[in-house]
Amino acid sequence: MRKVVLFVLWTFSVLSLTAQTARENLKRDLFKAGSNYYAYPKPSTSLTPAPKGMAPFYISTYARHGSRYLIKEQEYNTPYNWLRKASESGKLTEMGEKVYEQVSVLRQEARNRWGELTPLGASQHRQIAQRMYNNFPEVFEGTSIIDARSTVVIRCIISMENALVQLTRNNPKLVIRSDANKAQRYLHGGSG
């Protein structure tokens, strides 16, 4: 029995040698190093067609807010201050000075907007809604009812509203019902 267990462990360890590493993933797309700050990528796969004789009639989606500004001012100030001191000391390379300039612009743009939805975040939800509309037009015909819910966090509400605005641009006859309130505890992880 011990030999069987050792053989199985050896087999799995050999198979793991063929697995992708984080380093390989980052070489393909450095932005993935941003972890949960990585902007939502557009899908690159095609949809599976509906089975013969079947047609879409309903869509249910659960989404997180789009890209947002960092939550704390310090998350902008810390790298800015490091780069400022290095720049003032003449220790930055040409590339370092460019990074310092970009960090300065980002810091200024985010000022007093900590945690709010970015323009990219709003655009992401319009794009998601447009893909739903393009992929399943029959669901959005005529006076179809759209029932949307959000947490009371403003970036979530604005994300939802951007998606709804995009859908109504495609079909102004849609009946939209949207709501955001603390009574919807299931959206708040039960903490509402």
What are these model-derived regions, one by one?
Residues M1-A22:
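Bacterial Sec-dependent N-terminal signal peptides
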